Amino acid sequence: MVQEIKIRCKNNKKTLQLPIGSTLWDAYHALNLQMPYGPVSAKVNNKVEGLHYRFYNDKDVEFLDVTSSSGMRTYTRSLFFVLVKAVKDLFPGCVLRIETPVSRGYYCDLRIGRPIEEDDVTAIWRRMREIVDADIPFHRIQSPTEDAIEMFRRQGMTSKVRLLESYGAIYTHYYQLDQTVDYFYGSLLTSTGGLKVFDVMKYYDAVSYTHLTLPTNRE
């Protein structure tokens, strides 16, 4: 007999029974909720979790969409990962740093060994759209931290190495999108298909670098 757990949903005030090990995504579909802008994450006993989260005992759940600040952060992190994959696919060996927020987006420093042209920006947008349209899963992977550190070190991701070394945790969760891996503090969507709204454009600052701005809530 399959063991079941009880989920109490704050969105519609309903309670349901699910097999132990079910995910938040499973619960959302079982509840038949209608969220035009989500869900992108959920509060589980008031702690924000990604939709990959699995239940092993009774929980209170509130699903979140992009109209909440927490939901928008989940959307933005997921979009960042798509951007990372797109520029790596197009410009192997490039350096991308996501910097400070700007109006309705983020200021990104992309170094590809030459000035960025409008055609480059268009190519990035198109590659991101291809990744979104393919609805590729974001896989959440747990591994010993020392293994994750070594993997990021082999890929030259020194900032991730320093970050994980500073935590001192025994195990680490990181994400994989197709063949691209990265570490994010916080949840992502379950797949790229939920990232319907985004844009990429050139952005010039006071020095001679050319950058990108990544709007995350474009009308």
Predicted segments with their positions:
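Auxiliary tRNA-acceptor-end handling modules of aminoacyl-tRNA synthetases
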Residues: 53-72, 95-102, 107-212
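Residue-identity detector for glutamine
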Residues: 3, 17, 34, 142, ...
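Non-catalytic surface loops within mature trypsin-like serine protease
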Residues: 11, 112-114, 216
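Single conserved hydrophobic/aromatic residue that forms the stacking wall/gate
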Residues: 211-219
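Ubiquitin-like/PB1-type beta-grasp interaction modules and other compact soluble beta-rich domains
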Residues: 1-80, 84-85, 91-102, 126-127
